[in-house]
Every structure is written in structure tokens, then in C-alpha cells.
Amino acid sequence: MTEAPQILLRHHLKQLRLPTFQGEYAKQAQLCAAENKDHIHYLARLCEMELIERERRMIERRIKAAKFPSTKSLDSFDFKIMPSLNKPLTMDLARCDYVDRRENIIALGPSGTGKTHIALGLGLAACQRGLKVRFTTAAALVHDLIEAQDERKLQRLQKQLTSQNLVIIDELGFVPLSKSGAELLFEVISQCYERGSIIITSNLPFDEWTKVFGSERLTGALLDRLTHHVHILEMNGESYRLKHSRKNRQ
């Protein structure tokens, strides 16, 4: 191919936003010629490579937008250390069918039992399926909601949260909430209810959630929404982190 058509082709591919196509067309032409493949195979191969790369970039963007504190997969979780956790259910949830049904997940257990790891793993699985995910702690979310309310940007933040396929709220119960903070959190969970799915991790059993929200009425209404369509992951026992550290030293 002479220089002028090459320049024109690269220009067109750039305009069409086909970077993989642009980077691979010359190499794949040589390979297809060596393999005696026709132009249909050549174009099909380039299109497949473009789609694979496009999906990879999309997943990368989803993971970045989720704001995970760290990237952890379910494959790296040692279920043998936490026998109380239902592994078949957890792995089935990683298929993300529950998101299509707008169901919720609540992981309950003492501090250090791996709840955040499981939430991160489920969040990563959702990103890998092209779903929009947002991760936050309960304390950080309440802080953001109060700040947004003070700056008259509350509706914008609520809209961002309700547009997600999955919202993950970690560490509910670690910090008591103010009355206004509890009401704002209740409001955003109510808005997300049946629009998308919610994952909540908590170190407190349900009957102690009143300590967090400070109101039996608010707690009851919140649990009514969250547990309407819910999968409960029980994670009881000795600290997962302690067991995992001990196992690694052996």
C-alpha cells in the first residue's frame, strides 16, 4: 500500500474510533496472507480484536468509576477459612443475575470476617459484566450526602447513585449516624430500591441496626425495603484476616 492511502485509511479509522483496527490491520494482513485466509477472515479477525479490546477498556472504565479501595476477586477468597459463608450461593451471585432482578445482598458478621472482600469481589464481577457499580462506606456516603445537601447538590448526587446498577455500602454499623445523616441514607436507599441492587455489609445483626439509625421507625422501614428481595450472607466466626495471616505463616 502506498503512503497516501495508508494515511487516508488511518485518518478514517481514527474518525471511526477503531484504534485496535488501526494498530493491527497491517500485521493481520501479513498473517492472513501467510495463512492463505481470504478478506472475509481478515476483516472478521480485525473486528473481533476491536470488540475484545473495546470490552476490555469498558471494563477498565467501570472498575475505575466504581471507586473500589482495592481490587479483589472472589477467586482470591479462601472459603475454607470461613465455613459459615455459603460458597455456592456466593459464586452464583457472582453471575449477577440478582442485579437483573434488582435484588439486594446483605453480608453480616463480626469485624475482620471478609465481608469487604466479598463485597469487592461481587462488585468486580458486576463490572466485568459491564454493569455500573459504585462502592462507598456508610460513613463516607453520609458525609458526601450531607456535604452535597449543604452545597445544594444533593439531587445531583442522588441521581448519580440511582443511575448505578449496583451500589455497595460497606461498614454499616461501624459509626453511629446523626439524625440527619440517617435520614439522608434512608432516602438514598429508598431511591435505589427496585431501581438497582444494593450490597450492604454490617458487623451488626438486624436487631441492632437501631443503634446506627437511632430510630425504630426508620430502621424498620429501611429493613422492610432491603429485605424484600434479599440474599443474606452469614459470615460468623474467627477473623478471616487473622486466619489467613496464620495460614500464610505456616
Regions found by a protein language model. Give the residues of each.
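Walker B motif beta-strand of ABC-family P-loop ATPases
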Residues: 166
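Short hinge/gating elements
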Residues: 8-11, 27-31, 76, 104, ...
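Extended interfacial segments that mediate partner engagement and assembly in macromolecular machines
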Residues: 54-109
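Charged, compositionally biased N-terminal leader segments and the immediate start
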Residues: 1-21
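Interdomain "pre-motor" coupling segment immediately N-terminal to P-loop NTPase/helicase cores
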Residues: 19-70
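Conserved P-loop
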Residues: 85-163, 210-213
